Amino acid sequence: MAESTTTCFLLLVTGYVTAVMSEEAHLRSRRDFGCGQGMIFMCQRRCMRLYPGSTGFCRGFRCMCDTHIPLRPPFMVG
């Protein structure tokens, strides 16, 4: 019983460490879209291209896209 608990714990820790390292790598890859050089317009253009109608801003050295835009209700036909 103790061996299975230890194995389960080690798998859980390994999964957590892998997830944290993957997230850090992802954030590092997003680091530069103009925010590192102080050119926010590059970030804004990127966000507008990915999410039409959204805006972009820099937080730290990362480009963040604000997609909290209310959607229009669908038009009623008929």
From Swiss-Prot:
One of its GO terms (biological process) is defense response to fungus. Its main location: secreted. Residues 1-22 form the signal peptide. Salivary glands (at protein level). The keyword Disulfide bond applies. It comes from the Eukaryota. GO terms for cellular component: extracellular region. The keyword Secreted applies. Keywords: Antibiotic, Antimicrobial, Cleavage on pair of basic residues, Cytolysis, Defensin, Disulfide bond, Fungicide, Hemolysis, Immunity, Innate immunity, Secreted, Signal. Belongs to the invertebrate defensin family. Type 2 subfamily. Has antibacterial activity against the Gram-positive bacteria S.aureus ATCC2592 (MIC=0.8 ug/ml), S.aureus 6A (MIC=0.8 ug/ml) and S.aureus 15A (MIC=1.6 ug/ml), and against the Gram-negative bacteria E.coli ATCC 25922 (MIC=3.2 ug/ml), E.coli 23A (MIC=6.4 ug/ml), E.coli 27A (MIC=6.4 ug/ml), P.aeruginosa 3A (MIC=3.2 ug/ml), P.aeruginosa 7A (MIC=0.8 ug/ml) and H.pylori NCTC11637 (MIC=6.4 ug/ml). Has antifungal activity against C.albidus ATCC2002 (MIC=25.6 ug/ml). Very low hemolytic activity against rabbit erythrocytes. This is Longicornsin. It comes from Haemaphysalis longicornis (Bush tick). The lineage of its organism: Eukaryota, Metazoa, Ecdysozoa, Arthropoda, Chelicerata.
